[in-house]
From Swiss-Prot:
There is a cross-link at residue 32 (Glycyl lysine isopeptide (Lys-Gly) (interchain with G-Cter in SUMO2)). GO terms for molecular function: RNA binding; structural constituent of ribosome. Keywords: Cytoplasm, Isopeptide bond, Phosphoprotein, Ribonucleoprotein, Ribosomal protein, Ubl conjugation. The modification Phosphoserine is found at residues 46, 49. The gene is RPL15. Its main location: cytoplasm. Residues 118-131 have a biased composition (Basic residues). This is Large ribosomal subunit protein eL15. Pfam families: Ribosomal_L15e. InterPro entries: Rbsml_eL15_core_dom_sf (IPR024794), Ribosomal_eL15 (IPR000439), Ribosomal_uL23/eL15/eS24_sf (IPR012678). The keyword Secreted does not apply.
Length: 153
């Protein structure tokens, strides 16, 4: 259940359901036919992470901790986003919560560091997650596409 705590804010965010339409004028994408798609495209991230991002943009001084689904209808999904005030004394003095006051945790939601954001990054253990070995898709790609010519080879 809900419990009011000092330094914590709950935002209820409404996100429109469905896929993402490519924002092009009159459907003119230009280029090869393989990239002509406009309508049946799917966004790479979840609607929950979109909700977190919007809450984080709206409340720039707060830090996004996490979020959860609260309901949906035919048009919208509703999420509640937990935000923390990093300058509230109750947060700064509590050893369990003062980690989020550090500058490195600014805008976690924009960088895919929340639970919902991490799910779309392909991180994990085992043979199903080989494309993110090294921490990210980019790190794995860079390592596999870099030619190392050692002095003694």
């Amino acid at each position: 259940g809900y419990k009011a705590k000092q330094g914590y804010v709950i935002y209820r965010i409404r996100v429109r359901r469905g896929g993402r339409k490519r924002p092009v004028p009159k459907g003119a994408t230009y280029g090869k036919p393989v990239h002509h798609g406009v309508n049946q495209l799917k966004f790479a991230r979840s609607l929950q992470s979109v909700x977190e991002e919007r809450a984080g943009r709206h409340c720039g001084a707060l830090r996004v901790l996490n979020s959860y689904w609260v309901g949906e209808d035919s048009t919208y999904k509703f999420f509640e986003v937990i935000l923390i005030d990093p300058f509230h004394k109750a947060i700064r003095r509590n050893p369990d919560t003062q980690w989020i006051t550090k500058p490195v945790h600014k805008h976690r939601e924009m960088r895919g560091l929340t639970s919902a954001g991490r799910k779309s990054r392909g991180l994990g253990k085992g043979h199903k997650f080989h494309h993110t070995i090294g921490g990210s898709r980019r790190a794995a790609w860079r390592r596999r596409n870099t030619l190392q010519l050692h002095r003694y080879r």
